[in-house]
Amino acid sequence: MVQLTNKLFIVSLLAIIACGGGGGSSPTETDPGDGNETNPYDFPNATSLDQLNQIEIVTWNIRQFPQHSTTKSYVKSLLEVWNADIYLFQEISSESELISMVNSMTDYSYVVDDESGNLGFALVYKNSTVTFNSKNELWSDTPNSNDGDSDYENNAQYQFASRPPMENYITWTDGTKSMDLYVIDVHYKCCGDDSYDSSDPSDETNRRHHASLLLTDYVINNRSSDNVIIVGDFNNVGVQSVTNPTISPFTDPNIASSTHFLMVDEDILTGASSGYSWQGWTSSYSPAHFDHLIINQPLFQYGSTTTTGVIALPTETNTAATTVANRISDHQPVFMRFYP
């Protein structure tokens, strides 16, 4: 299924891989996918994202990685089959386990954050196409506690739930052309609702909205001529629309800053809930599209060549959704790729 909207081709991987899936048995709670006895983590339904001369970027909240003894095996196999240039992760609980996994992947290298504790960030990138230049953990030098006033700039880290955004300066090349990118990995405060209450500095939605104000201001004033992609788990609970206060500084046309940004997965946000990145498989809450990729103005010119989608993990692994949630993640990855 292909939809052409907002100058972006939005592709559902679910439709693609459903045509190419094997004749395996129904997903079960105990078997690790449609693998075989030799390698139970060989997933024939998993689809390569790698395309010649394109940049592929995947964002994924990988839920307290590794949450299960099999998590690393699942994730390593999937990352290698997807074969994307750039992966941005949230919720890395064990840096050593992440490092161990990537060290066993000969084609990839990693960068981890220093400031986010046991729910950290990681960049994993393909050695043949990506050069890591530097990182900057934004607002890591600001207080991370509620000071009780309405000035969100003087305790910016608190607005980001003590997880300072990890800005990665990288260079992509295919050997004939190259592009510098600033990719900012975020993980906003969870919970609450979708009501902005400016009188309560501890309110979850208040903090998420302020986090977006900080980011839009930073990019507009410091990276206006650079290629910037903001990715991650925005935790935009409540109504799934461009006016949700969590994301509105990027997406609401009534807010001036939104003219500088484009959420490339907006059609997923405003589409059917069955296509959202978070399905609530083991939760009483309704599905929501929490995971986004947002570009700034210099990248608008590539809109017509940009493809985005949610990677449907139960289909990719031929594994029951509850098993996916408990052994891999309760979030599904979201990807974008484009011709630079």
Residue spans for each PLM region:
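Bacterial N-terminal signal peptides that target proteins for export
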Residues: 1-9
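C-terminal motif of bacterial Sec signal peptides marking the signal peptidase cleavage site
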Residues: 16-18
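Metal-dependent phosphoester-hydrolase catalytic domains
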Residues: 37-39, 160, 220-229, 236-340
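Active-site-proximal beta-strand elements of phosphoester/diester hydrolases
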Residues: 54-64, 136-137, 180-193, 197
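Structural recognition of the beta-strand scaffold that forms the well-ordered cores
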Residues: 56-59, 85-91, 111-113, 120-125, ...
